[in-house]
Design a protein with these regions (language model features):
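N-terminal type II signal-anchor transmembrane helix
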Residues: 1-24
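N-terminal hydrophobic or amphipathic segments with adjacent small-residue motifs
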Residues: 4-6, 26, 170, 279
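Signal peptide-directed extracytoplasmic domains
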Residues: 17-167
Length: 305
């Protein structure tokens, strides 16, 4: 090693200079590839001249195991030290993919967006990686490397959720509900109401119904049951044998029906305190609340003619 280091230091520009025969290209560094494989691949692509020189520089810097996988774009020839720096910092040279997931998006819907933005990721791959975390993939705008895979995208979204939920830790603890129940409730609220005030009202009503042992009777679960963005349930649907059918089964559904935003999570943790047990959205676009079924029916006749 000392002899090799001396050769590199003595050779100076000769050993660190880019090779002849360079052409603009993309080079894919596979996840888990050894420093030997990476060095040889770059040499074969005429990005570097001497594989051993790259290995020695990375070893001297303590970066042999810090090479970042992904697709690197080389537009102009670069010296060895610049190439080493790019490998370690993940400077891919390719504009990142910008992708936005809206509040209330399901993993199934996210998978379609990811597949459209990343040719190398199928909707099935993303669904498999993301489905166990339905409700915990925070809806937001993200920037990802073009070489990102389903697992890394899911990991970034989960990390964002964990960071965002910290702002509600006190409210969640004070609510007396588990994080799991809060997320499930928030996913229902996300689909049932739009404004912050309405979300807090709906959350309060649904918690009230749970406390009284009443079925939640939330219509939005049927979109999740049937895998559709929107769905108006029929009388037959109200009897469909699904654990997510909140007409047929009391209590919260077994899991979230979408990935809620922070507004809905906050509403679930800190709902409005009322005696209401019913709500509906009228043709006037407003929500109307009732304490009794008779009042609810009156609202139905008045606002849903």
């Amino acid at each position: 090693m000392l002899v090799a280091l001396g050769v590199i230091l003595g050779g100076g520009y000769v050993l660190t200079a880019p090779p002849s025969g360079f052409s603009s290209q993309d080079v894919v560094i596979a996840r888990g590839a050894s420093v030997f494989a990476v060095a040889q691949e770059l040499a074969d692509a005429h990005i570097i001249a001497y594989p051993m020189a790259l290995r020695i520089v990375l070893r001297i810097e303590g970066n042999e195991n810090r090479i970042r996988a992904g697709t690197y774009r080389f537009v102009t020839s670069e010296n060895l030290l610049a190439v080493c720096d790019r490998l370690v910092t993940g400077a891919y040279g390719i504009p990142p993919v910008r992708i936005t997931f809206f509040e209330g998006t399901t993993v199934r819907e996210m998978a379609a967006r990811v597949a459209a933005a990343f040719p190398g990721i199928s909707a099935a791959d993303f669904s498999a990686a993301g489905h166990p975390y339905e409700g915990y993939l925070f809806p937001d705008t993200y920037l990802f490397s073009t070489s990102a895979d389903a697992a890394s995208i899911v990991a970034a979204m989960r990390a964002n959720f964990n960071a965002k939920i910290q702002s509600l830790s006190g409210e969640i603890q004070a609510s007396g509900h588990s994080l799991s129940d809060i997320v499930i409730m928030a996913s229902l609220v996300e689909k049932e109401a739009r404004s912050s005030g309405a979300k807090r009202m709906v959350a309060g009503i649904l918690w009230n119904r749970l406390q009284r042992g009443m079925p939640l009777q939330v219509d939005s679960v049927f979109g999740y049951i049937y895998g559709r963005s929107t769905y108006a349930p029929s009388l037959a649907d109200l009897r469909v044998n699904s654990p997510y059918n909140t007409y047929l089964h009391k209590g919260l559904p077994p899991g979230p029906i979408d990935n809620p935003g922070l507004d809905s999570l906050e509403a679930a943790a800190n709902p409005a305190k009322t005696n209401y047990l019913y709500y509906l959205t009228g043709t006037d676009g407003r929500m109307h609340y009732a304490m009794t079924y008779a009042e609810h029916e009156a609202n139905r006749r008045k606002y849903l003619p």
